[in-house]
């Protein structure tokens, strides 16, 4: 079975924040950009198969904002409980120095859905090569979000995903740097070479013994028996 879902997310504090998304089997197909007032497809191929009028999403957002205002007044403007989000950073592909790759910052347990995610390279903010998804709804009605950073791994660079949210007392930094095998020390190299030489010598000695035994066996079998 396949599941398609669409929905709106609206939050006020104090400005209006919202989004309209459409998902299929848990994957986002498109969202409506509220500033540009246009439909943004996650893959260009999707736009060739179907279309969606962004005005429909904008109308739903307007309705959601109105309903939220009514509910806020009825609750005497009681604020929502802020949850502390959790972040994880990992590469999209196995890391090879000098080969282009993508870092992914996965932020889960977001509530309310208002968050700042920033990439840092060597403690400096990075803007180029950054892409961020809209919010995805979890089963418990919290949210998760992904931020991507295209980069070229180098042993001189370290990266951090900086997460800022009302549920955190201070920004959280999730650190990542390429894992480069430590070079062998001179002592280790000497031991490895000595072991390799020893194994080689043992092989030569054992081989020589087998050859001698084979020659002796062959010589014995060639002696003629009694007439």
Swiss-Prot record:
Region (Alpha-1): 1-82
Ranges per topology, Extracellular: 1-189
Annotated InterPro entries: Ig-like_dom (IPR007110), Ig-like_dom_sf (IPR036179), Ig-like_fold (IPR013783), Ig/MHC_CS (IPR003006), Ig_C1-set (IPR003597), MHC/Immunoglobulin (IPR050160), MHC_I/II-like_Ag-recog (IPR011162), MHC_II_a/b_N (IPR014745)
Main localization category: membrane
Connecting peptide, as annotated region: 177-189
UniProt KW keywords: Adaptive immunity, Disulfide bond, Glycoprotein, Immunity, Membrane, MHC II, Transmembrane, Transmembrane helix
Keyword Signal tagged: no
GO MF entries: peptide antigen binding
Bilayer topology annotation: Single-pass type I membrane protein
PROSITE patterns: IG_LIKE, IG_MHC
GO cellular component: external side of plasma membrane; lysosome; MHC class II protein complex; plasma membrane
Disulfide-linked positions: 105-161
Superkingdom to which the source organism belongs: Eukaryota
Keyword Membrane among record annotations: yes
Pfam families, A to Z: C1-set (PF07654), MHC_II_alpha (PF00993)
Residues of the signal peptide: none
Glycosylated residues (UniProt): 116
Gene Ontology BP terms: adaptive immune response; antigen processing and presentation; antigen processing and presentation of exogenous peptide antigen via MHC class II; antigen processing and presentation of peptide antigen; positive regulation of T cell differentiation
Transmembrane segments annotated in the record for this chain: 190-215
Family recorded in the similarity comment: Belongs to the MHC class II family.
PANTHER family recorded: HLA CLASS II HISTOCOMPATIBILITY ANTIGEN, DQ ALPHA 1 CHAIN, MHC CLASS II-RELATED
Protein name: H-2 class II histocompatibility antigen, A-U alpha chain
Gene name for this UniProt entry: H2-Aa
